Amino acid sequence: MSGLSHLESEGCRNLLGMLDNDEIMALCDTVTNRLVQPVDRQDAIRAILVYSQNVEELLRRKKVHREVIFKYLATQGVVVPPTTEKHGLIQYAKSYWEEQSPKLKETAEPVKKTEDIQLFEQQAKEDKEAEKVDFRRLGEEFCHWFFELLNSQNPFLGPPQDEWGPQHFWHDVKLRFYYNTSEQNMTDYEGAEMVSLRLLSLVKEEFLFLSPNLDSQGLKCASSPHGLVMVGVAGTVHRGNSCLGIFEQIFGLIRSPFVENTWKIKFINLRIVGGSSLAPGSSLKPSVTFEQSDFEAFYNVITLCNTPEVRPNVRQILDSGTGDQVLCSGDEALLNKKEMNLPTPLKH
């Protein structure tokens, strides 16, 4: 549910009404991670209000321009210095909405208005429909959002479309990065800040462009009864006009319990293989090598490895090998299978 109060929602609704249709639809995509498809402008505004965690988060969005907030305050009779920066205007707006609230809080629950009842019924209907998640579509929408956002941080492609950062990950997210290019290596990263910065460096400092292959071979999805959704995607790696190789990436997504229909990244396995390291005769069209049953088994591996009883064995194994090796002793066959799928590295 929305983290905005009733007055904040009404104020932001009027403020958003000053944006044009393209800006509203783009803002809706950003706020909902492209997982909500509005049917019209009003539906998009409603989604923006419902899925925003708080009013500051919404007003700080790049697509909510400083001039729009200033114009809204002027229409409400709030006079502010024209040179006030955006963060100052946000505070003016918050103060204005707070002043509109009754000085004494009502002790009795107010009678719900007709539109409030309709909104509640609509939300309940959406919640019921959300239980039947199309994971294939969710995977496609997620990949479109993730790779567009990540690739837009490449300085050769102009200004970023939106802010990249740790807010898209769970705080204890884990990244396992395996690459086989001029050399072969595997590194683990942990924590939202560290994982976010490592992925960002691929496009911002190494100038890579990851192009996902979202057909039936390049994208596979699976879910667990605990709410973990796994998305596997393969694609090609580019720099400028050169295709450098292929990649395979597995995401573990968990729905946020605090923001409706919002998913955050719990773990990532990323494997990049340079074109010079591909086995002779390999097809350049990338495809996910895991089957649906492998996804489910891989989820079980991750779950087991987070238990205290298994973690010491995991560390021992990670310290002794390279590539996507065994995570837990009981699932050697599965992850050894993936290790076998890696192309034989070139000898130098």
UniProtKB/Swiss-Prot annotation:
InterPro entries: NTF2-like_dom_sf, UPF_C3orf38. SUPFAM superfamilies: NTF2-like (SSF54427). Keywords: Apoptosis. One of its GO terms (cellular component) is nucleus. It comes from the Eukaryota. One of its GO terms (biological process) is apoptotic process. The keyword Acetylation does not apply. CDD domains: NTF2_like (cd00531). PANTHER family: DENSE INCISORS. May be involved in apoptosis regulation. This is Uncharacterized protein C3orf38 homolog. It comes from Rattus norvegicus.
